[in-house]
Curated annotation (Swiss-Prot):
Subunit structure: Homodimer.
Family matches, as Gene3D superfamilies: Anticodon-binding domain, Bira Bifunctional Protein, Domain 2
Protein name: Histidine--tRNA ligase
InterPro entries: aa-tRNA-synth_II, aa-tRNA-synth_II/BPL/LPL, Anticodon-bd, Anticodon-bd_dom_sf, His-tRNA-ligase, HisRS-like_core, HisRS/HisZ, HisRS_anticodon
Native source species: Ligilactobacillus salivarius (strain UCC118) (Lactobacillus salivarius)
Source superkingdom: Bacteria
GO molecular function: ATP binding; catalytic activity, acting on a protein; histidine-tRNA ligase activity; transferase activity
EC number: 6.1.1.21
Keywords for the protein's UniProt record, in alphabetical order: Aminoacyl-tRNA synthetase, ATP-binding, Cytoplasm, Ligase, Nucleotide-binding, Protein biosynthesis
CC terms in the record's Gene Ontology section: cytoplasm
Length: 431
């Protein structure tokens, strides 16, 4: 029997994992500047955590969730997105309390799961980096989160970005617009896709997000939510636009954008790239927005929030397509060459000692001859080789070679063990 990874998953091998670590560390560095701290939540949650928060008519709930009943007959799902689990933790741990500084800022990283048709940049197990900020109903925080998302993508050298912004308004806005949209769509009901027919009276805003070509034609002339904003919703959106202008962030308004999850209101946004990874077609890499009601749905007090999620696989596809050389290094400082069985123990002690001094060190474990060991040192791009044979062992010395220019010096083992750093310059200069 041939065992293979499940469809829609990927093995991240050591040659690739360094890129992932680089992306994650860059994100952590930026989030720290914005005062966001990491939260780690379970990979699986109760089914209701997502069915209540994502919306009963969303594709995630109706088509894409990996859910099952465990041995205790509990309905469990693998998390399809990061926000709901963070909100559940926020409520369960009473982080809404007055003793916790607001806004409460947190970020997460990890795998998510959706049963979708696998394609480039969209797998069934995929990875997200996301942020959430709770407890402040202020458009300024919406803009800060958007600015942070732009900063993050630009930190990877991505400058050809398209920021699309919309507002879903407040509850009154959505109720008024909902009815207007139903009135517009009902004459076209027979022409709508099956999914859109089902959503027409349950959640007509989701029809705007349909991928069906006929649906797209129909909604092209649909009324705009921007014409139904209440005074408060209009003020919120105008402030967002003004602050984006103040920060010099270019954006376009897309009044048909609704996002794939039902919990958003007020500001929503998507950041797209036209990288050659997507054949020059604008493709969403990062998206998010403002939400109210989500904390209450999971048992907490009324608490607004704002956040975004970024697809790591898509970001890496862009970086690969742009052929950017990522500053990823796992340098080998010293390769210790042992000649003869009698040097086995001292070679092991030397590599351990060098590691304890803060250097990266390695040695041969296959009993290869010196020629083979030097080949390994070359393949591993070792900066130095430290060679010890039976004669050197008797004299408590070793041969230190700077691989870049071939300079060699004889060094005392005691000096290697006590202060290898002082020997580096001597070897480089050949003194």
């Amino acid at each position: 029997m041939k065992y293979q990874r499940p469809k829609g998953t990927a093995d991240i091998l050591p040659s690739e994992s360094a890129k992932w670590q680089y992306v994650e560390e860059k994100a952590r560095e930026l989030f720290k500047k914005y005062r966001y701290e990491e939260m780690r939540t379970p990979i699986f949650e109760s089914f209701e955590v997502f069915s209540r928060t994502s919306g009963e008519t969303s594709d995630i709930v109706t088509k894409e969730m990996y859910d099952f009943y465990d041995k205790g007959d509990r309905h469990i799902t693998l998390r399809p997105e990061g926000t709901a689990g963070v909100v559940r933790s926020f409520v369960e741990n009473k982080l809404y309390g007055p003793e916790v500084q607001k806004p409460f800022k947190t970020y997460y990283m990890g795998p998510m799961f959706r049963y979708e048709r696998p394609q480039s940049g969209r797998l069934r197990e995929f990875h997200q980096i996301g942020v959430e900020a709770f407890g402040v109903d202020n458009p300024t925080l919406d803009v800060e989160v958007m600015a942070m998302a732009v900063d993050l993508l630009k930190s990877f050298g991505l400058n050809s970005l398209r920021v699309a912004v919309n507002t879903l308004g407040d509850l009154e806005t959505r109720n008024n617009y909902r009815q207007a949209l139903i009135d517009y769509l009902e004459p076209f009901e027979a022409e709508l896709s099956d999914d859109s027919k089902e959503r027409l009276h349950k959640n007509p805003l989701r029809v705007l997000d349909s991928k069906d070509e006929k649906d797209k034609e129909i909604v092209a002339n649909a009324p705009s939510i921007l014409d139904y904003l209440t005074e408060d919703a209009q003020k919120h959106f105008e402030t967002v636009k003004s602050l984006l202008n103040d920060l010099g962030i270019e954006y376009v308004i897309d009044s048909n954008m609704v996002r794939g999850l039902d919990y958003y209101n007020h500001t929503i946004f998507e950041i797209m790239s036209d990288s050659k990874a997507f054949n020059g077609k604008w493709t969403t890499v990062c998206a998010g927005g403002h939400y109210s009601g989500l904390v209450e749905q999971l048992g907490g007090p009324q608490t607004p929030g704002v956040g975004f999620g970024l697809g790591v696989e898509r970001l890496l596809l862009i970086l690969d397509a742009e052929e950017d050389t990522l500053p990823i290094e796992n340098p080998l400082d010293v390769y210790v060459v042992g000649i003869g069985d009698v040097t086995n123990a001292v070679t092991l002690k030397l590599v351990q000692n060098l590691r304890h001094q803060g250097f990266t060190a390695d040695r041969d474990y296959l009993n290869r001859k010196p020629k083979g060991q030097f080949k390994s040192a070359n393949r591993l791009n070792a900066r130095f080789t430290l060679t010890i044979g039976e004669t050197e062992l008797q004299e408590q010395e070793a041969n230190l070679k700077f691989m870049k220019n071939g300079n060699e010096i004889s060094v005392k083992l005691a000096d290697v063990e006590n202060d290898f750093a002082s020997l580096e310059k001597l070897a480089v200069e050949g003194e």
